A protein has these predicted regions:
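N-terminal targeting signals for export/organelle localization
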Residues: 1-54
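A short beta-strand-turn-helix
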Residues: 54-76
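Small/polar loops that bind or transfer phosphate-bearing groups
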Residues: 59, 80, 110-111, 133, ...
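Short pre-active-site segment immediately N-terminal to redox-active cysteine/selenocysteine motifs
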Residues: 74-76, 81-84, 149
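Hydrophobic beta-strand anchors of alpha/beta hydrolase catalytic cores
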Residues: 77-78, 107, 153
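Conserved redox-active cysteine motifs that mediate thiol-disulfide chemistry
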Residues: 80-97
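Conserved segment of the thioredoxin-like fold in thiol-based oxidoreductases
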Residues: 100-138, 150
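Thiol/disulfide oxidoreductase modules built on the thioredoxin-like
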Residues: 124-129, 136-186
Length: 187
């Protein structure tokens, strides 16, 4: 409300005092730009420092597992995907390979709203062997992290803080950059 009040007051002064219109307009514009930049930076920092959401995923057998139980004390890559999503399908071999190469990082595959039979058939047809495969039955994880599309890949550090995210198909280079951020440059 303070910003709205300041804008109304500035508008009143601009209307009443013709000689001060240009300096007041310049000051108001500068202040508004500074406020917008600061608010944007704070929002970005808050988003990047978010912890793991309090969401339960389900194994293909129906067992519930909370996000914070997936890889305590270990960097974590979470991939939100679906069998009907072409970019998800194209990136799966990259992620499957990475889960074997980067043993110090846990890779979790959170299928969005599909039945276990559909997921099993997809894995068999595509000859994929994915560890840590779960279902996000109600897309709670997607909502909690603000994902607006698939695939979405989340990169958490060993302390459970969201360090980076990527929406869209993941290339080897993009995956490597995300892994460097959560593992450290020397690993």
């Amino acid at each position: 409300w303070g910003v709205v009040g300041a804008l109304i007051f500035t508008g009143f002064l601009l209307w009443r005092r013709e000689a001060q219109r240009k300096p007041l307009a310049t000051a108001a514009l500068t202040g508004a730009l500074f406020w917008a930049a600061t608010a944007g930076t704070i929002t970005l920092i808050e988003q990047q420092a978010r912890g793991m959401p309090d969401v339960a995923l389900h194994s293909l057998n129906g067992e519930a597992v909370h996000m914070d139980q997936l890889a305590p004390g270990q960097p974590l890559v979470v991939n939100l995907w679906a069998t009907w999503c072409p970019p998800c399908i194209r990136e799966m071999p990259v992620l499957e390979e990475a889960q074997h190469i980067y043993q110090d990082v846990a890779f979790v595959f959170a299928n969005q709203r599909e039945q276990p039979e559909t997921i099993r058939s997809f894995l068999e047809e595509n000859r994929l062997n994915l560890n840590n495969l779960y279902r996000d039955d109600q897309a709670q994880l997607a909502r909690a992290v603000g994902s607006n599309g698939l695939p979405t890949t989340l990169f958490y550090n060993a302390q459970g803080q969201l360090i980076d995210s990527h929406m869209g198909e993941l290339s080897r280079a993009t995956l490597a950059r995300g892994l460097e951020k959560i593992r450290g440059p020397d690993q």
